[in-house]
Amino acid sequence: MTNPSTINILISNDDGIFALGVRTLANTLAQAGYQVTVVCPDRERSATGHGLTLHRPIRADIVEDFFDPKITAWSCSGTPSDCVKLALSSLIENRPDFIVSGINHGSNLGTDVLYSGTVSAAMEGIIEGIPSIAMSLASFSSRQFQPGADFACGLIQQLYDHPLPDSTLLNVNIPPVTADAIAGVMLTRQGLRRYIENFEKRFDPRGKSYYWLAGELVTEIEQPDHIHLPSHIPTDVQAIQHNYITLTPLQYNLTDVASFEYLQTNQWLERSRDIK
């Protein structure tokens, strides 16, 4: 087994620097011997996707007395993706062996990953060629972060000794149960979740209207047969309901290979050239 003290880890999140999830993760990894640096938003930045700060300055400040003394921690005024970019370019001296984003307070399952600042911070690492993991606790009410943090220790060792293919992000969701109630670990495909969007119209004290987004989760929708993996492989949404830790490999290349091949073999391109 590789000595953890030789492995450098950069941790970020979208819940903010003072979130319990990132504190539990960072302290657990540091106490296991890993070299840990934390760079997180200075406040909650959930559902910011892969947004970047382009029109105002980004500020970063050292955070003391919140994490294990062995950890160097920074708060950043930008988005989760800003945090990773700034860390790699300006804040840390040594290129990390891994980037871990989380542990998010709430799941990142199915199409949630498209909106997730947690996943985007990890994806920024993949874009930079660094093995990266996004970790989420699949509940907004539970505070059972320790099982996920403990799992991260072993997962990083495994990925260090047996790396994933390049450009592969591992999206991990942890069921909100005690360690002894976790059913196991399951490799899953990304599910498809949709929400009934409800923009509630409200009025401020000056009588000016504004809108507040609220959403109600719709039961998971099955994906079309041509999308990537056969339906007998469980989705992350299905597996988490049975208390499995889900491992879903993701990538930043969004090319739809099946549709590309369909367009190649059905004279679609030739016909499109005749469109006026």
Curated annotation (Swiss-Prot):
Assigned keywords, A-Z: Cytoplasm, Hydrolase, Metal-binding, Nucleotide-binding
EC number(s) on file: 3.1.3.5
Localization in the cell: Cytoplasm
GO terms of molecular function: 3'-nucleotidase activity; 5'-nucleotidase activity; exopolyphosphatase activity; metal ion binding; nucleotide binding
Enzyme class: hydrolase
Catalytic activity: a ribonucleoside 5'-phosphate + H2O = a ribonucleoside + phosphate
Cofactor binding comment, as recorded: Binds 1 divalent metal cation per subunit.
Residues bound to a divalent metal cation: D14, D15, S46, N104
GO annotations of cellular component type: cytoplasm
Cofactor requirements of the protein: a divalent metal cation
Entry superkingdom: Bacteria
Similarity comment: Belongs to the SurE nucleotidase family.
Role, per record: Nucleotidase that shows phosphatase activity on nucleoside 5'-monophosphates.
NCBIfam families: PRK00346.1-4, PRK00346.2-2, surE
Protein name per UniProt: 5'-nucleotidase SurE
Chain's gene name: surE
